[in-house]
Design a protein with these regions (language model features):
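Short pre-active-site segment immediately N-terminal to the catalytic Zn-binding motif
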Residues: 150-166, 225-228
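Hydrophobic or amphipathic, alpha-helical segments that drive membrane association/targeting
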Residues: 1-138, 145, 338-340, 344, ...
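Catalytic glutamate of the conserved HExxH
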Residues: 163-167, 171-175
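Secretory-pathway/luminal and periplasmic proteins that interact with or process carbohydrate-rich
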Residues: 132-133, 194-201, 261-267
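Divalent metal-coordination and catalytic microenvironments
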Residues: 108, 170, 237, 322
Length: 414
């Protein structure tokens, strides 16, 4: 399916959802059931074929074609079982226990009780500027779910406690009530199909070819048909967040995350990597990140970053709506918030152990980036040496060398 057809199907699902929400959900459930029916049908066909062939061979009837049938039935059975029992990797990061961060787990429990949501089974702390709840299928396509919450250390550094709790309420909002359970079931189903589609990409043989043909037809249509449901779920999660913490707090969290995550990507990381010019060994970023994220971003940068964020339209590449649409749905002002105060930092939810986790992620970052840092240090050394050479001969430089010198200085100052 090409992109134009996919977008067309997404728009049809959005219109269907707007015209008749219950009817749309029934159609989504029916299309999901079609995938289940295909898996069960393949499982029964392969099992029946295996039983028939083995029974025939046990009664002395042997034909060369039986070998091919055994291989085909075995391949189909294996593919069906893979579809029923997809295995997912655990989230990256460090698993937190209630004893590590009592205040965090108490806050999660309060949110759970207020929205009457299911329990979070495992909580992970990672290095992303994000928070997310993922529900991995416990039994593949056929039910069960393990709820994982991933919390980014930079996010804890950037927000005060109320705004961070608004983010947690948004994430927990994905699991609330009957609609949440239906959306979570569709989400788990989508994950299972996506993994099966990925795992079978390079398989060969007639059984794999038939399975791939079905997936090429079914999976993009399933993704398009469920897109409106996933988009609705984001707005509903925002609504839950606004209801629990207040619309102003939820909106301020969205805006502050948009601006500060942009600042980290465009300003902090380039500046941090420039330290490789003077430092041969990698330097952990999170101690300095903590101090800088506790400050207000530069005014000009913040205003321009917000303008850019508000210009981004909601498209089919991401089920998350754009910032403008999310703020409008919350009926909130599209302006810069008062920045989070470091005296009420969400990092305090980790308790006295926050310094330990910062040191842990600094050490891990240095380990993961040691080779790249070494190469960057050597590269900046060559740039600096060449810049010094051209600076010494500046009066004799050609126009091309002057342009080269300007480019080298820009790289050193980046």
């Amino acid at each position: 399916m090409d992109r134009a057809d996919f977008i067309h199907l997404v728009r049809l699902s959005e219109h269907a959802s707007a015209d008749d929400s219950k009817g749309y959900r029934r159609s989504v459930a029916a299309f999901a059931a079609l995938g289940y029916a295909w898996v069960v049908g393949c499982l029964l066909l392969s099992a029946g074929l295996l039983v028939w062939v083995v029974n025939a061979m046990l009664h002395g009837r042997f034909k060369a074609v039986f070998i091919g049938l055994l291989v085909a039935a075995g391949g189909l059975l294996w593919t069906s079982l893979k579809a029923l029992w997809c295995r997912f990797d655990e989230p990256e990061g460090v698993e937190l226990q209630a004893g590590d961060a009592p205040a965090l787990f108490e806050s999660l429990e309060r949110i759970r009780k207020k929205i009457k949501g299911p329990p979070i089974h495992r909580v992970f702390l990672d290095a992303d500027f994000n928070a997310s709840i993922r529900q991995h299928p416990r039994y593949g396509l056929f039910g069960g779910g393990v709820n994982y919450l991933s919390i980014g250390l930079p996010l804890l550094m950037a927000l005060d406690r109320p705004r961070f709790l608004a983010v947690l309420a948004h994430e927990y909002g994905h699991l609330r009530g009957d609609h949440g359970r239906f959306a979570a079931w569709i989400y788990r189903t989508r994950l299972s199909w996506a993994m099966l589609n990925h795992d079978l990409r390079h398989d060969e043989g007639p059984v794999a070819a038939a399975t791939q043909a079905f997936l090429r037809w079914y999976f993009p249509r399933f993704s398009a048909k469920t897109f409106a449901l996933a988009r609705q779920d984001e707005y509903e999660a925002d609504r839950i967040s606004g209801k629990l913490l207040g619309k102003d707090v939820a909106a301020a969290a969205l805006t502050e995350i948009a601006v500060k995550s942009d600042w980290v990507a465009r300003e902090f990381w380039p500046d941090h990597w420039s330290a490789a010019s003077a430092q041969a060994l990698p330097v952990g970023p999170y101690v300095s990140m903590r101090a800088l994220l506790g400050l207000a971003p530069p005014g000009d940068f913040a205003r321009e970053s917000l303008r850019q964020a508000l210009r981004r339209i909601s498209d089919v590449d991401d089920t998350h709506p754009g910032l403008r649409d999310r703020l409008e749905a919350l009926e909130a002002a599209k302006c810069l918030p008062a920045w989070s105060s470091s005296s009420r930092s969400a990092l305090d939810l980790l308790g006295p152990g926050s310094a330990k986790w910062i040191a842990h992620f600094d050490k891990q970052w240095c380990k993961d980036n040691a080779s790249d840092w070494k190469q960057h240090h050597a590269y900046l050394g060559r740039v600096r040496a060449r810049a010094a050479e051209l600076t010494a001969s500046e009066r004799r430089n050609s126009a091309e060398e002057m342009v080269e010198l300007g480019n080298l200085k820009r790289r050193l100052n980046a």
